[in-house]
Amino acid sequence: MSSSRSQSPETPKAASEEREEEEKESSEQPDTPKTSSEKSASRSQSPRESREVSQETETSENQEKIKEKDDGDDQPGTPNSYRSRETSPAPKRSKETRESESPEKSPVRSRSPRRSSARSPSRSPRRRRERSSERKQSEEPAPLPEKKKKEPLDILRTRTGGAYIPPAKLRLMQQQISDKQSEQYQRMNWERMKKKIHGLVNRVNAKNLVQIVRELLQENVIRSKGLLCRDIIQAQAFSPGFSNVYAALAAVINSKFPHVGELLLRRLIVQFKRSFRRNDRGVTVNVIKFIAHLINQQVAHEVLALEIMILMLEEPTDDSVEVAIAFLKECGAKLLEIAPAALNSVYDRLRAILMETERSENALDRRIQYMIETAMQIRKDKFAAYPAVIEDLDLIEEEDQIIHTLNLEDAVDPENGLNVFKLDPEFEKNEEVYEEIRKEIIGNADISDEDGGDELDDEEEGSDVEEAPKKTTEIIDNTDQNLTAFRREVYLTMQSSLDYQEAAHKLLKMKIPDSMQNELCAMLVDCCAQQRTYERFYGMLIERFCRLRLEYQQYFEKLCQDTYSTIHRIDITKLRNLARLIAHLLSTDAIDWKILADMKMTEEDTTSSGRIYIKYIFNELVEAMGMVKLHSRVTDPTLAHCFVGLFPRTNPNSARFSINFFTMIGLGGLTLELREWLAKGLKKKKGMLDQLKAESSSDSSSSSDSSDSSDSSDSDDSSDSSSDSSSSSESEPEPPKKKKKKNSEESSKKKEKENIGRRDRGDKRAERHRDQSVENKDKDRRRRQDSDENRRPERGDDRKDRSKDRRRQDSDDEDRKGRERREDSGERRRGDRDRRDRNKDQEDHREDRRDRSKDREDRRDRRRHDSDDDRKTRRDRSEERGGRRREVESDDRRRRR
């Protein structure tokens, strides 16, 4: 056996060949009984030899198996477990096969290991070589197996879905497949759809929800509803804080495809029941939040909420009560709106649980009791801190909402098979049907994805086939998302600029559209007003814009006019900043002075805020321009229409009010012309009154004189006529002509003298009458002056008006100062409160840090103590082992002795 072991590695193979040859010979010879010598030889074989023979047999069999395996590995692309006998090399025939192939079945004689081992090992190699050569000559060459052609592997059929394929390459591979009904094309479409839905669901938020929904509807939501529901549930589980966003997404899709919303709700209910049975509080709370927001969005019925509350509070524990309160916080506002009686019963149950815990020994945790009390307070506040649906997520009209009345017992099958690809024999037909549905919902406008893989290739854009232009539908964004982004960009641009020139340059480089120019001007004015004090940066920036384009100047003038019309709504800080801004723009002639035309300085048309606003404007103008220059502007005839309201000349009372106002604010020099006008008006009025008095007195005197003169003239006429008649009667026979002429001249002279005397007497009488009327009026005026009610001399009246205006102005100033003091005190109180809160937070933070450091020290001490104990125990154990070892050694020495 030692010589056989020292053979070359070919010895096991030769031994196997020899054994096969012997079996062949034994099968060909007739079965003869063994001789006594053979029996004795087999009996005389030792067990060691039989073991060696069996080992050689096992070695040969193992080598044959390895050879078969190596031959089978030559076929690539086919797993070893699926290889058949046809594709592998022809194996050696076994004993049973040879027996079945032999024409004459003869009983096979069993080989004894003693017989093979009894042979001489020195001649076995030569005999083996001879027999192997004879066998090779006798055997015919076995036909080589035909190798199958290596088929290309389907990347999408592997276990991991294959390596990453860029979207462009995947689209190219999909285009190369002409048959859309083939499994490979549908599988590629499924994989593309799965990746796109996963990416869109992960990107959704409250601002881009509408855009994400439109992009989701570009895919076949009916086929991929399982994927969509799975991705929404997974995304909500990873970020429970966005449960309301995912619920809004589900509500929008549910309004168009109700079966998708029903599948999502069914899966959530099944997941809730599983986690509730496993006592998995984290998963249960997340699922409960999602279901609550679906109830808020009117996807699920409120009966489901009541069933969940009954299940949680039937046998209350710490976890179940905590989950119920978390559920109430999310959907309590909606239940208060649509089912207040049911909500009252739930809170009654919570109150009963709280009372039971206070009475019984098996009380709930103190934290849970505090949560119940907090829930009571939240209900008392009518869920003000937990609104059902925020404004940005309220996208579905009430008539478009579809409510699913699923309960905890109905939801059984989650339909997980929808998550797996299935071949659709009517793929093209279903795609056409969905395309029609999609066009009815969102129209023909295609939304290009933001990912690079979904963009169209340049080759497709430059194709020779010209398509007809598609009608696009205009989408109106009512969420003001673009406006918010624009305001943010403008604000960041101004904050990142060193001075107003750089800010103006950056803003002009933004290429602001015409529709946003008005918004830019309004934002600049708002930013200036929001500052704690006036900053010259904004004034210079607005001045630069006004000088650049006329449109900006008109926008700012319109804003200034609107500001004065709503000045009573603005607080004192904003009012002061706006007044200084307008004064700067007026002093630099950046805007027109016509904005002051709307300001009217009368007692009826002004308010306290308006007067303070005008006061700040003119004080700043005096500081910027000087009193002389400002006075020249006020008296400029080309700007007279701008100051008609501030310096009114239509009513003396209004003029007096304006004079008193500007005198009180220290700008009485601006009212010199108004004072002159008022004085001239008073003089003119006095002259007119005197003229009217004179006219009235002259009318009365002329009437009396006319009556006297008429009487005297009648008597004179009668006497003249009588004298004339007598003279004529006497001189009738011989009328001397010359004497008649002399008499006529004398009579005319007499008449003239009489008329002059009569006129002098009338003038004297008129003067006496006028003097009498003046005396009477003076008496009346003195009588009125003596009375306390109507004593109003002109100078005293002015003094009274001035004192009244001064008192009114003082009261307004006191009110304003009181308001400012109250606001300052309020700001100080708020600042003190904020400071106290910050100090308290800092103290709490320091205390937490001290507690954490103390905990770390305690842990370190415990660790050090434990390590000392461990070292001590190890030392004791080592000492014990050393003592035992020494005892054993001493016992051994004792035995040896």
From Swiss-Prot:
InterPro entries: ARM-type_fold, CWC22_splicing_factor, Initiation_fac_eIF4g_MI, MIF4G-like_typ-3. Residues 485-601 form the MI domain. Disruption phenotype: RNAi-mediated knockdown results in germline masculinization and the accumulation of unspliced mRNAs in the cytoplasm. Residues 36-54, 93-107, 131-155, 743-897 have a biased composition (Basic and acidic residues). Expressed in germ cells, oocytes, and sperm cells. The keyword Magnesium does not apply. It is found in: Nucleus; Nucleus speckle. Coiled coil: none annotated. GO terms for molecular function: RNA binding. One of its GO terms (biological process) is cell differentiation. Its main location: nucleus. GO terms for cellular component: catalytic step 2 spliceosome; chromatin; germ cell nucleus; nuclear speck; nucleoplasm; nucleus; spliceosomal complex. Residues 1-10 have a biased composition (Polar residues). Keywords: mRNA processing, mRNA splicing, Nucleus. It holds the Pfam family MIF4G. Residues 1-155, 444-472, 689-897 are annotated as: Disordered. Residues 447-466 have a biased composition (Acidic residues). Required for pre-mRNA splicing and for exon-junction complex (EJC) assembly. Hinders EIF4A3 from non-specifically binding RNA and escorts it to the splicing machinery to promote EJC assembly on mature mRNAs. Through its role in EJC assembly, required for nonsense-mediated mRNA decay. Plays a role in the nuclear retention of unspliced mRNAs. Plays a role in sex determination. Required for early embryogenesis and tissue differentiation. Belongs to the CWC22 family. PANTHER family: CELL CYCLE CONTROL PROTEIN CWF22-RELATED, PRE-MRNA-SPLICING FACTOR CWC22 HOMOLOG. This is Pre-mRNA-splicing factor CWC22 homolog. It comes from Caenorhabditis elegans. The gene is let-858.
